[in-house]
Amino acid sequence: MTSSDWANPYGVRKPYGSNGPANGFPDADARATFSADHPLVPWKQPDHMDQWVDVDHSGEQLKRFLARWPTLDELLDGGSGDGRVVIVSGLPGMGKTSLIHRCIHEARQRVAKGASEAGDPLAVCVPTAGLMNDGHRISVGPDGSFAPVELINTRIRKEIAKRLLRHAFPEERVRSIVAEEDPYQAYGDMRDLLDQHNALLFAVIPHIRWNDAGLRTDFLRSCLSAAHPRIVLFVEVSHGAAETAREEVAATLHGSAAVTHLALRELDAEDIWRFSHSARAANGGPGGLVEPDRSSLVAAHSEWRPSDVRELRRVFHSAADALRSAPHPWPIDADALRPHWERRRAGRASLLRDPIPPRSGG
């Protein structure tokens, strides 16, 4: 870890290093590390809330999530017949994973508020592809090819099983759930186990680059069938310019009261300015930086046209790093950002001229 990484106010603290130690608890001897490209995970790293900003319509979608979130009684009610599926869709790099983690943070808080009246249910959170939500972890086979759907579903259950075992659920019951060939039966057995231990499951399912649109539709439907009472699945769906996941999700799961669809869209003119406030606080101020220049950053949108939230964070991180050596405090404005976005733009142009061959599989 370099001193610039340590000091950079736009770096995101990695929860317990990266995806956490094996036991799921912080290591008192571990040194904090920061990244220019890590999702915000406030349910695991509370100070990530300080870096949450409403970019790419995420605030609007968070309000939608909270408005549709069921009561704790409804989540626990085995007679309701339904669990819940929350689908977050949008272009790559737009902050879908951060929005999912923020939704889980809010859901855990709501569960905690009503916990005493419900016997203090345990909320078990399982990012099945790690906190970065990297679908390759579960969608690529041992030989590097795309894994069969059955293997993907089994891997998801194995990740859930690991977390249940850490919470001292009966090993024999957990192993039988993984071994069950019928996914619907497996999640039904999981529901029974959660009910017996007064627990809830919040599982995060990553975006998977399906080789066939029909497989993706079938997988989304299987997620809905897997969402039994006490089980909430948060499913990430990325899409490119050639397709609209919003329409696909609506057509696939139309009319189900158990589904909440959150759709992120393109950045607007205010998002550069909004993102400038995602700096970590330090010594009572935003990491030693001068208050960002609003008019300059709003005007920069038409010149820069950032492609996604990931690009915003990397450019701000790079600019803040460069400003550390300035002889006096310097505002994050268009002039400070321009050299860094121009470098990225040149890199994109180079890739368009000489594209990298696509990877096989997920």
At which residue positions do the language-model features occur?
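Hydrophobic residues on the short alpha-helix immediately C-terminal to a glycine-rich phosphate/catalytic loop
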Residues: 103-107
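Mid-core helix/loop region of P-loop NTP-binding domains shared across ATPases and GTPases
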Residues: 151-228, 288-303, 312
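The catalytic "switch" region of P-loop NTPases
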Residues: 92, 135-140, 199, 211-304
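N-terminal pre-Walker A segment at the start of P-loop NTPase domains
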Residues: 39-74
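Conserved catalytic segments around the Walker B and adjacent sensor/switch elements
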Residues: 110-143
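Residue-level preference for the first positions of well-ordered beta-strands
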Residues: 83-87, 199-202, 232
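C-terminal alpha-helical "lid" subdomain
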Residues: 2-42, 47, 61, 265-362
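Walker A/P-loop nucleotide-binding motif
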Residues: 80-102
